């Protein structure tokens, strides 16, 4: 295995697009992907024809309500004929998509990349049941884990092992609310 380049080429975010974070019964998933993509491209001053790499960050298929949603939504964004890759890392899919785009650009696989993501978890019939299928099938599935219980167990472990306190978690929440309050499209816009 080769070592990473100690001085990789610089990569910059040159455009951003986002739709409001709320229930959108007035728009299809394709509409949301198209709107955010067009806004990001316009903000960057580039066209989809300038894009070499498309990174699709989508939730597990069970939450999207269909198999391989990226294959259906990317054409609506004008991404036909572009090299694409799907990324899914649970609650960190957005940053994982951006990071994947950065690494591919630094690796010389293209000059312009776009990370596109969409979440419509309301389309799943039973969100906890879907999440329960992503845990270890032998040891964890019968426990009935959810994202909340999984995070609570991890937080408890961090408190026992490294001395985190409830105040630390409150600081994280307060910081996140403060950041969200600066984004008028966020789900929670007040600190």
Question: For the regions a protein language model found, what residue spans apply to each?
Answer:
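Condensing-enzyme catalytic core mediating Claisen C-C bond formation in acyl metabolism
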Residues: 1-30, 34, 39, 133, ...
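N-terminal glycine-rich anion-binding loops that anchor highly charged ligand groups
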Residues: 7-15, 41-52, 61-75
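Structural motif
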Residues: 13, 55, 114-116
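Metallocofactor- and cofactor-centric catalytic cores in central/energy metabolism, strongly enriched
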Residues: 24-34, 50-56, 61-62, 67-68, ...
């Amino acid at each position: 295995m080769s070592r990473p380049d100690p001085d990789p080429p610089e990569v910059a975010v040159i455009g951003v697009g986002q739709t409001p974070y709320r229930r959108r019964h007035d728009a299809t998933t394709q509409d949301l992907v198209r709107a955010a993509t067009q806004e990001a491209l316009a903000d960057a001053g580039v066209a989809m024809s300038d894009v070499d790499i498309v990174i699709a960050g989508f939730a597990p298929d069970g939450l999207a309500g269909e198999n391989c949603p990226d294959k259906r939504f990317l054409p609506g964004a004008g991404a036909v004929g572009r090299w694409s890759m799907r990324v899914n890392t649970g609650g960190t899919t957005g940053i994982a998509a951006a990071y994947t785009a950065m690494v591919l650009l630094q690796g010389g696989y293209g000059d312009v990349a776009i990370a596109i993501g969409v979440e419509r978890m309301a389309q799943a019939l039973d969100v906890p049941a879907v999440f329960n299928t992503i845990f270890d099938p032998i040891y964890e599935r019968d426990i009935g884990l959810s994202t909340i219980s999984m995070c609570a167990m991890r937080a408890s472990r961090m408190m026992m092992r490294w001395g985190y306190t409830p105040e630390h978690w409150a600081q994280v929440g307060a910081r996140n609310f403060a950041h969200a309050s600066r984004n008028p499209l966020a789900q929670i816009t007040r600190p």
